[in-house]
Every structure is written in C-alpha cells, then in structure tokens.
Amino acid sequence: MNTTINVHLNVTVDDNNSDSVYDVPTLILVLLSILYGTISVLAVLGNSLVIWIIVTSKRMHNVTNYYIANLALADIVIGLFAIPFQFQAALLQRWNLPHFMCAFCPFVQILSVNVSVFTLTAIAIDRHRAILKPLSVRPSKLTAKIVIAGIWLVAMVLATPMAVARRVIMVPEGLIWSPTDIDKLKPFCQAVNLSSRTMLIYSMLLAFLQYLTPLSIIFCVYTRMALKLWGNRAPGNAEDFRDANFM
C-alpha cells in the first residue's frame, strides 16, 4: 500500500543539521504534565458529580439546573478531549497521536468553549427574566431542553471549519533543513485545507460570536438586573433604630 506524505518546507536549505526550535526541559515537562493532568481529572470528576446530583435529585430538575448541567457537560468534554492532547502537542512540538485526532481535538475544544459561553448567556437571560418579570410565565423544561439542543447545534456548526482545516503534515525538525535529511521530518498538526485568509476570517467570526456578542448580552442583562435590584426597597416599614440593634 502506497502512503502519501505531505511535506511543508518553510525553512532554510542547508547541508548542516540543526536542533529543534526549542527543547523543553524534562523537569518542566513532568511538572506541567502533572499540573495539566490534575486539572483534567478534577474537571471531569467535579463536573460529573454536578451532573450526577442534578440527574438523581428530582427537586433539582429545573430550567436553571439544566443549564448548569449542560455547562458541566461542556467542561467534561474539554477536560477529556482537549486539555490532555492539545497540551502534549504544544509541548512536544509534534503530533504523536492518531491522525484523525488532529482535526477532532481542536474541533472539540472550540465546540466546548462555544457551548460554555452560549450556556452562560442563556443563564443570564433566564435570570434577567426571573428578576425583571417575576410574574411572567417561566420557561418550561422542554423549552430549556430545546435551547440546549440548539446551543450544541450552533456550537457544532461554528467548530466545523476547524475540523475541516486541520491535518497532520510532515515538517522539518529544525529551522535549517536539507533535502537529504528526509529522516528528520516530524508529524505536525496544522491548518492546511483552508487558506490563511479564510482562517483569519474564521477567527474574527469566532471572536465576534464566541466573545463579543455573548459578553455584550451578559453585560447588558446583568446591568439591568443590578439597576433593578439597587432601586428596590425591602417590603415592610423601615425603622432605623430597630435595624441598628440587629447590626
């Protein structure tokens, strides 16, 4: 069976060998591996516990907790599929994992971040409705489930270009490379199926939809809630002397 290898060479051609771009000290590698591994394990265990509590307790079955469970699920996904693999690739400067994961891991990372941000936005809107219109009809559990499904669908669509773009290619080990050093190539995960201009537009679109738009919505609704609560007085007659005795 013939194997086709894509080699991307953006280096200086020279007959001399060279070291890699940078070498990570073993101690730093071990320390960061422990830290990232701990973060990943805690993220999975902690958020799994949150989901388990919400699922097993009927009184926890409400719209807000559904959103919280969805937020926890997104954190579990990023803890399982993004943190460990993206970390090792960044440190080792090569892709030692199965090639399909080159597209899968960045896709999952963007997917999880999108779900988290959109869910936080949904929670903010739900709290805004509860505080500013407390007597209005509360969204049903079915509505919350539909919103959550929509969040995952939109997040998946926005993450798809990254899966399309990323592929494993062979690149030189060092900055200086000679055509005779064919054995000194390494696998590297890189965006090759989409042009640099397309990736720039995609990054700008993500920044707008993933950061600026949710931030604006959350800022506006929480500002309105703060103003509403700040101007409200507690029920009952205020008595300064009585209230001072409770302080």
Residue ranges and their predicted role:
Residues 68-72, 152, 207:
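Transmembrane helix-bundle signature of multi-pass membrane transporters/permeases
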Residues 37-46, 208-218:
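Single-pass alpha-helical transmembrane segments
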Residues 1-45:
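Extracellular N-terminal segment of 7TM GPCRs
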Residues 44-55, 76, 83, 111-134, ...:
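Cytoplasm-facing ends of alpha-helical transmembrane segments in multi-pass membrane proteins
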